[in-house]
Amino acid sequence: MKNCSKYTATQKGRQGVFEAITPEDVATLIYTSGTSGAPKGVMLTHRNLLHQINNMWEIVPAVPGDRFLSMLPPWHAYERSAEYFILTHGTQQIYSSVKYLKADLQKYQPHYVFSVPLVYETLYSSIQRQISSSSPARKTVALALIKISLLYMEAKKIFEGTVLSKNPVKPSSISYMFNCLWARIVAALLWPLHNLANMLVYKKIHSTIGISKAAISGGGSLPMHVDKFFEAIGIKVQNGYGLTETSPAVAARRPFCNVLGTVGHPIKHTEIKIVDIETGEVLPDGSKGIVKIKGPPVMKGYYKNPSATNNALDQEGWFNTGDIGWIAPHHATGPSRKCGGILVLEGRAKDTIVLATGENVEPAELEEIASRSSLIDQIMVIGQDRRRLGAIVVPNNNEALAAAKRKSSLDGNNDEAKDTVMNLLYDELRTWMAGCSFQIGPILVVEEPFTIDNGLMTPTMKIRRDRVAAKYQSEIEALYE
């Protein structure tokens, strides 16, 4: 009886502790990655985390037994949220890393992958290299079929209503009917060739990497050429958006409405608005401004940092993300009828470069375009308070030297080779950025890549601009002399 009384008392004490914990209590502290400043402790509550678990199934309709592969550190907000979702839905989780990703994809054949855009860019590059290394005939056929599949997908989007548009004025009914009819004809004509591509090319890719249901991308913007490629070969990539301060997910593309170039519709019970950068006034759909978030996923505040909390959260509970974006206008009919309310991101407000001329430049847009070059592994655009833009470039040495050797007789490591590579990089930037409003002038070529280990990238593989700029400060100064 004595032991029983002791056990009962202990149980009552535990029950008291359980009852004392409320949904608004802090469940965890997660520190921001500090892309452009010092890390801050984000206080996430039980309500924040439960909102993610309860509302992610609409985006990831997993069933018991599904296999998930992820490779982010478990203390990262994106990975933490994904783990909670996986563990509460009876599914399997496979942990991998960049080093073992290719082998693990083939071995475990996951239904879903949770990762960041850079991983999908790496997969894209790997597939492209495999195609390029095949025989000339196979390479020509594969590239031709991929182009046909891209055209097929573009035609489908017109009559499916998933063509992204910034224009608030809907197209005329007659114009849409004509375009829709033409798109259906084009899709019907291209379907046999697209189906042939599935059998000859895409089936082999699928058997190598799995991802039979969807790849969930978060932590950054997905380059459009990567987005289009995976859709063309039949691998659904659902891009989402969130921050550590928002638990993290606030928007994501749905399986039934996967509009390329966007981060999808808001998660349930989450509000998103776009405000003017200077005045703070709410902007109409289609207008670009600062993205603000309100709702259950928004953090309680920064740990022991009321000043930072007040800067990020206003009195009405709106969180200033610091991101620039716009919301797609609603169209009842037409090729964009399913896009209304979708969020589109266009860079970071605090990453904006202000030139000495007073012009504002979004570096992320230029970096995304420049990184399409096979000669460039990484690039960071610079130019704050300068007369013109510049860039720090980490070249793809194998591709760059191969291109240099094709251009002239080089031994690969002499000064002539370096000069030739430099000239090739300038040519590449001019070619890829020919249609841009801003051009990149001087470039600094560095051999050391930006990585998590050397502190030049965050765990979600975003470049830490402040650290890169500090590391190469003297070289940047010399670049502009």
Over which residues does each language-model region extend?
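Conserved pre-ATP/AMP-binding loop-to-beta segment of ANL
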Residues: 8-31, 38, 61-67
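Conserved AMP-binding A3 loop
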Residues: 27-53
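Conserved ATP-binding/catalytic segment of the ANL
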Residues: 32, 279-286, 290-355
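Conserved AMP-binding/adenylation subdomain of ANL enzymes
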Residues: 50-67, 74-178, 182-203, 236
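Conserved ATP-binding loop and adjacent catalytic segment of the adenylate-forming AMP-binding
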Residues: 189-195, 202, 207-273, 277-289, ...
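Adenylate-forming
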Residues: 298, 334-371, 399-419, 436-440, ...
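C-terminal boundary motif of the adenylate-forming
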Residues: 324, 372-399, 429
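Conserved C-terminal "lid"/linker of ANL adenylate-forming enzymes
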Residues: 378-382, 426-481
